[in-house]
A protein has these predicted regions:
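A structural microfeature
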Residues: 58-59, 89, 130
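Conserved catalytic-core motifs of GNAT/GCN5-like acyltransferases
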Residues: 109-111, 126-138
């Protein structure tokens, strides 16, 4: 998206990843999203969003793709807390993977630090017939 979308993307990210904090803690700084878009492997066509009926961003999936290695990494996948448990995370990630397949992608790397995200990745990547799963046991 363009600069007009930055506040909405930042707010959706806050609602997805800081659901246990009061909204008054949100500082409104969306410079991180502009920085994300300046990354060499960022592609707008792999920055997928799902909109709520009111037009707000309900879910998002940002993927970086390297044409040379035909590899990708999921950078951000999130669903605003008020839209959890509606299948939106799975929908945006599945759409991102569909786009990667059309580009000729052969490998996708995803990592999660919390069980809900890990379960989402496992369910989707299993459906995509991924054969290599790496698990680091701590």
């Amino acid at each position: 998206g363009d600069a007009q979308e930055y506040p909405a993307r930042s707010w959706a990210s806050w609602r997805a990843f800081h659901n246990d904090e009061p909204d008054s803690n949100y500082d409104g700084d969306y410079s991180w999203y502009a920085n994300l878009q300046s990354a060499p492997l960022y592609r707008r066509d792999l920055d997928v969003v799902a909109s709520a009926p009111d037009g707000s961003i309900a879910a998002f999936c940002t993927i970086f793709y390297d044409d040379y290695t035909r590899s990708a990494v999921t950078v951000l996948v999130g669903v605003a807390a008020e839209h959890w448990r509606r299948g939106l995370g799975k929908a945006v990630m599945t759409e991102g993977l569909r786009r990667l397949k059309a580009l000729g992608c052969t490998r996708v790397f995803s990592t999660a630090h919390e069980e809900p995200a890990d379960a989402l990745y496992r369910s989707i990547l299993k459906e995509m017939k991924v054969t290599d799963t790496w698990l680091k046991v701590l």
